Every structure is written in C-alpha cells, then in structure tokens.
Amino acid sequence: MGKKRVMVPAKDVDLSSIKYEPEIVQAPHLTGFWFRFFVRLIEAPLIGPFLLTMLKKENKIDQLLRNTVFPEEPMFKPEYPPQEKEHSVVELDEDGRPEGRVESALNCLPHYDPAKLWENSSATFRYWKIRDYAYAYQSRKVTPSMVAESIISMIEENGIDKPPTPLLLSFDAAEVRKQAAASTQRFESGNPLSILDGIFIAIKDDIDCHPHPSTGGSTWMHEVRDVKKDAVCVSRLRSCGVIFIGKTNMHEFGMGTTGNNSNYGTARNPHAPDRYTGGSSSGPAAIVASGLCSAALGTDGGGSVRIPSSLCGVVGLKINYGRTSMEGSLCDSGTVEVIGPIASTVEDAMLVYAAMLGASPANRISMKPSTPCLPTLSSDDDTDALRSLRIGIYTPWFNNVHSTEVSDKCEDALNLLSKAHGCEVVEVVIPEIVEMRTAHLVSIGSECLSSLNPDIEDGKGVKLSYDTRTSLALFQSFTAADYVAAQCIRRRIMHYFMEIFKKVDVIVTPTTGMTAPRIPPSALKSGETDMPTTGYLMRFVVPANLLGLPAISVPVGYDKEGLPIGLQVIGRPWAEATILRVAAAVEKLCGESKRRPVTYYDVLGAN
C-alpha cells in the first residue's frame, strides 16, 4: 500500500488548499449469468478475498482505512456541541400525546381552503393533501370506509400486492376494512382522534406493523422473527387514527439504492414503469407517488428515504438520528439509520413527523436532543426567518452529477428561493468527501452484518438475493480496525460540518446525482451489481447518515424525459424545523410544475 499517510488534525486543515476530487466508483456492472457467477467467486474461500481486495484497492478503501493515521479519537455515535435555538418555531412535547403534537403541527400550517379546491377542478395536477381528506370526511362527502373500498379495489384489480411488480408485500383487505370502519364510526360520532384519523399510510417492510409480518424484503426473516406489536413510531400513528394499508416492497434488508427485489418482484417508478423507484424504500415512495396513500414510513441508513423520494417526485424527510425511537424495526441498534416519513407534500410529511417523533430513553441520556420544533409557516415570522436564512453550497460537489439537467434544475430552485425571499447563498468547502463516503460504507456495512450475522451463520445466508450476498461479502471483509478508523473519520467530518454551520443555516445539494435509472430486463430475475450507479444515487446523501443530521428531499422539476429531480436540504443537528421551512418554501415556488405520474390512482376523486 506504500508509505502511510498521516492526516493533519481536522482543526488545522487549511480549507483554502482543498481541491475537490470527483468521486469515481470503480466496479463492474453485472446482471444475469455473469452476476451469479461473480457472486459465487467472491464467496469462494481463496479467490473471493483476492477479488474483494482488488475492488477495495481500485476504490482506495484499504488505503484510506489501513494506511492512514487519523489523530482524532473515534466517534461511535453522532455527538454534537450545544445548538442555538431555531427561530419562529413552535416547541413540541415529545412526552405528550401524539394527537396533541399533530394538533400543534396543524396550527403551524398556512391557511388552506379545501372546500374551494374540492369544488373547482383545476387543469394543474396536484396530490390530495391530508387536509383534503379531513375536509371530505368532516363534510360527509365520503367516509374512510368508502375510500378504503376504492383503495382495496385498486390494489386487487391492478395486482399491486402481487408479482411481478408489487408495491405491497403484505396486504389484508379485511384488516383495512376493520380499521376504516372504526374511523368511520368516530367521524359519525363527531370524535375523530386527530386530522390523521382516516388517513391511509403504508409501512416499509422492515418496520413492525401488527398483524403483518416483517420480512425486510427477504423470503425468510418472518420465520425467525415474530411481530407481536407495532413499532413505537407505528403505535404513535395508530393512536392518531391512521389506517395502515400494509407493508411495502423494499430492496432486501435495505442493501441497495435501486429498489430491485428479485424475491418478490421489483416495484416500478410511477413516472416511468421501465425505471427504478430508487431504494431501499422503493415501495413507500412509489405507493405515495402513485396516489394510493397520503404518506408512508421508510427507513434511511444511506439515503433510503431521500433517494426514492427524489426519483419518484415526492417529499422524503430524514430526521435527526435519535429524534425518534427505532424500537420495532429490523435495524434498531445501528448508528446511521432512522425511520422517516415519505409524503406527497411537505405539510403532510410535517404532520406525520409530529405524530411519530420522540427519542428513546437511551438516546435522551446519551445524545441530549434539543426540544423538537416545527416552523410557524402560518405567521409573518416565516417570511422573516427565510429572509435571514444563509444557504451553503459547495459548487464543485453540487455540480458533480451524471447529467447537468439535475444540477441546473436544483440551481434554478435555489435562485428562485434567493430571489423570492432574499436568502443569502454562501460558498462553503467540504473536505475529505471520499473519506466520508468510505467511513459511511464501513459503518453501515458493519452494522448490517452484525444484525444479520446470527441468522447467516444459522444457514439463512444462501436464501439471500445475489445483490445482498455481494454486499455482505464486502462487509465481511472489513475488520475491527477498519470500523474504528471509520469512526475516527466520522469525528473529522463532524468537525468540518460544525464549522460550516457556524456560517450557514443549511447546506443545499441535489438529492441524487442522476434521475431514475432504467431497469435492465436481465436484472429482474437475479438482481444486479452496479456500483457506479449507486455512487451517483448516494453522492449527496451520506453526510446526513454518517453525522446523524436532519435532511429532506423536495421535488423541484423534471429532466427532458419527464423524470423527477429532487433538491436536498441538510440542516444543523436537531434542526428539522429549519429544513421543513426551507422545503415548504421551495415546494411553493416549484409546485406549479408538478406532473401527474403515468401510474396514478385518484383515490379520493374516485368517490
């Protein structure tokens, strides 16, 4: 590996000397027979380690981890200095009733008259908001049971819960009818639990939602792990009257960014059925984009909420690490993954977020989270807060995309925001981006392996899909020393970002470096390995996961093929209110260009 590299302490790095190095991922793109053959090779006792060593050498992974000296101590979980309070916000009681937090969130929203929009059809496409459903229920135009019947018929008639292109992996019409009947009764009695009462939400298949099994997109996880109750975040939503339509498709165990699932079939992008949805929360993003439900819950360990949200043209919120409990999810002990909402609008994501938030007792002790807040979008203070906003952009990184259509559209949105609200755009420098990517890969890979290893050792590994086996082979090559080195890098990157956040309030990037990739027909049966595409999809999402920061993807337009493009807003620690405020402003400026997906179900209009 050559002479070792000794890093200067992060606090002494001269940012003026930093030169951006484009991230180039070196790995073959394989499908079909050659992919299956490749997997068998890397799993072989002798040749496998050799091939993995060569791949890691090509991508400088071993050089960064094993031939570099980092003076920083490891940071095994995100640690933050004390943060300033956000401005023009409402504080929420995370120990209070979820219904109360949802009511507070509702009071933060700007004025909206569903009756006017309900009665006057518009040529401009828009998604039905949660407030539209609430108005329809309260005015007795429809009932939750009527909407449930529409959803059930759409699911059954279009094979949405069946191969070869399922959005749902677990669906029970009787269970949906039961929940809808209870909600209908509450409305008839004049006692809805909250504005979320009667709202239909889907749950990613690595989050427990009783009585459905949790498979993680695999063929066997439900055989070794019983679901006896809801995950904590699901339970909070249920207490608000939410109706759960089932468990959604996903990239097996979250180990992929396209959404490919050779076990059950691959979900398709509602804007282009020959394109991937993005992953790993493929089903949640696609089911929201297709109009079947108002929101969904996904998990995000490496962009898995934001990537598919961007590719499917919806909103995806990655909350701060530790902001809500992970209890009841398949990955409840890692340091990079969180549960977050996907919704058709920023305000709907905000309402769902308000219901589900609440740190676990352990994280309250170790992380000392700031009080959760929401932006007061309904007041004049919102305008003042936007006017004083400082937006950070690292231009060479921002522009390192597969097609300039992506960066151009995101830059247009940024210019609109600056022109409309007088926001200041500040050029920043982010050092060691390649090191950051490597540290994230080792962290999430080691944590996934630790979670799955007991079942793999028990013989379940051979039942995994080929692309999952590829990922696990790489993860198994990491050592304890690699993991510690990755955590030293985490501390360095945290220092850089905390220094940047002394100058700016948010950092803005494209959400992904490309629009939705085409699905190779040869990848449907056995999956594929395409690390260069993964590199483009994950280019901008890694900091929020490695550092635990809040981030949101909001749609800003389309490329020349009609594929959605998302803008990502990354916030300071615990600053969900700020990124929600920025996303709401961007959505308002770019919302008129929203297009109806090719695959769209008008659930509320059908009644």
From Swiss-Prot:
Forms homodimers. The active site is at K204, S280, S304. It comes from the Eukaryota. The keyword Hydrolase applies. GO terms for biological process: lipid catabolic process; N-acylethanolamine metabolic process. Keywords: Cell membrane, Endoplasmic reticulum, Hydrolase, Lipid degradation, Lipid metabolism, Membrane. Transmembrane segments: none annotated. It catalyses: N-(9Z,12Z-octadecadienoyl)-ethanolamine + H2O = ethanolamine + (9Z,12Z)-octadecadienoate. This is Fatty acid amide hydrolase. GO terms for cellular component: endoplasmic reticulum membrane; membrane; plasma membrane. Substrate binds at G301, G302, G303, S304. It comes from Medicago truncatula (Barrel medic). The keyword Signal does not apply. Catalyzes the hydrolysis of bioactive endogenous fatty acid amides to their corresponding acids. The hydrolysis of endogenous amidated lipids terminates their participation as lipid mediators in various signaling systems. Converts a wide range of N-acylethanolamines (NAEs) to their corresponding free fatty acids and ethanolamine. Pfam families: Amidase (PF01425).
